[in-house]
């Protein structure tokens, strides 16, 4: 099992997380991607290396998506056949939940499944106070919106589309490396594409842990939300345009060819549905999301 943690300007929470993971399973490979944090944060990464953590470094900040792809490529080249579990650097994922997702991912890998195992934040932390379990308003609104729009666009219900705790079976690593997006949109794009790429989405309940004020988060609400929603809007727009325009054009052509109205309506709907499926499939595989 490889535990992949992208990190940008982390604090000691990352060191504590790595030590807790090492204590729980000394055999697990912990891989941290320093996403251009800069010299001021070098002592933290040095401390991680001393503790036996593998650290790969981007010379400049590229974004979470790029850091995840760097880690996936490293794992594929250096530890082929192993599952990958991603976690956030701010300590919002408990070690026991990280390993729960990892074990479930290993089970799927042994079965030869193409799977993404999602740690969905639905369980309160019994060891945290009121502030430690209270979901920030922007996170609550953002996740509720993406859950709803994701279901509308794909027909799939995922309780936590923004979770950073995910398990990947080795069967999908090549596919993951082909998904575009260097920042936060990468994680959402993989979920959209999974619904069209025969990749199973499995949900595992985990404890929700939030730091008051989330001081170590580098998420920019406006810019990064726009990036996340761009692939979703492209997906929905393609569905509307192909559905409405193709439907109307096909109906006009079929009626013009002399088909009875009922036959023309049914034929137009079939043509529209096939076109919609084809366009969405191209969108998901050729860089539209």
Predicted regions, residues:
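A conserved acidic beta->alpha catalytic loop
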Residues: 34-43, 91
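Short beta-strand-to-loop acidic/aromatic patch adjacent to the donor-nucleotide binding site
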Residues: 81-92
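Conserved donor nucleotide-binding strand/loop of the catalytic core
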Residues: 46-81
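Acceptor/aglycone-binding surface of glycosyltransferases and processive sugar-polymer synthases
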Residues: 59-60, 66-74, 95-184, 211-219, ...
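Hydrophobic helical membrane-anchoring modules
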Residues: 11, 179-256, 269-289
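Conserved short acidic donor-positioning loop in nucleotide-sugar-dependent glycosyltransferases
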Residues: 9, 35-39, 62, 71
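Short, well-formed alpha-helical segments that are part of the catalytic scaffolds
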Residues: 9-23
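Cell-envelope/extracellular polymer assembly enzymes that use nucleotide-activated donors
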Residues: 1-2, 29, 189
């Amino acid at each position: 099992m490889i535990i992949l943690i992208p990190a940008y300007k982390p604090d000691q929470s990352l060191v504590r997380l790595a030590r807790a993971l090492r204590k729980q399973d000394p055999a697990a490979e912990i891989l941290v991607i320093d996403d251009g944090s800069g010299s001021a944060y070098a002592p933290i990464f040095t401390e991680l290396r001393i503790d036996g953590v593998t650290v790969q470094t981007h010379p400049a900040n590229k974004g979470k998506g790029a850091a995840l792809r760097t880690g996936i490529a490293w794992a594929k080249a250096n530890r082929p056949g192993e599952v990958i579990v991603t976690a956030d650097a701010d300590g919002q994922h408990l070690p026991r939940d990280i390993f729960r997702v990892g074990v479930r991912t290993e089970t799927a890998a042994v079965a030869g499944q193409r799977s993404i195992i999602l740690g969905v934040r639905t369980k309160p932390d019994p060891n945290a106070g009121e502030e430690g379990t209270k979901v920030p308003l922007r996170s609550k609104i953002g996740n509720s919106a993406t859950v709803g729009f994701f279901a509308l666009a794909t027909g799939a219900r995922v309780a936590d589309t923004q979770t950073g705790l995910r398990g990947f079976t080795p069967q999908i690593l090549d596919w993951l490396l082909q998904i575009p997006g260097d920042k936060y949109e990468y994680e959402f794009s993989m979920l959209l594409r999974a619904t069209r790429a025969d990749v199973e989405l499995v949900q595992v309940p985990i404890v929700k842990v939030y730091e008051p004020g989330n001081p170590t988060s580098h998420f920019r609400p406006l810019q990064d939300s726009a990036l996340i929603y761009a692939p979703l809007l492209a997906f929905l727009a393609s569905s509307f345009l192909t559905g409405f325009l193709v439907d109307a054009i096909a109906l006009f052509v079929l009626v013009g060819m002399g088909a009875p109205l009922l036959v023309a309506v049914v034929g137009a709907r079939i043509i529209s549905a096939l076109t919609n499926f084809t366009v969405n499939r191209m969108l998901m595989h050729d860089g539209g999301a």
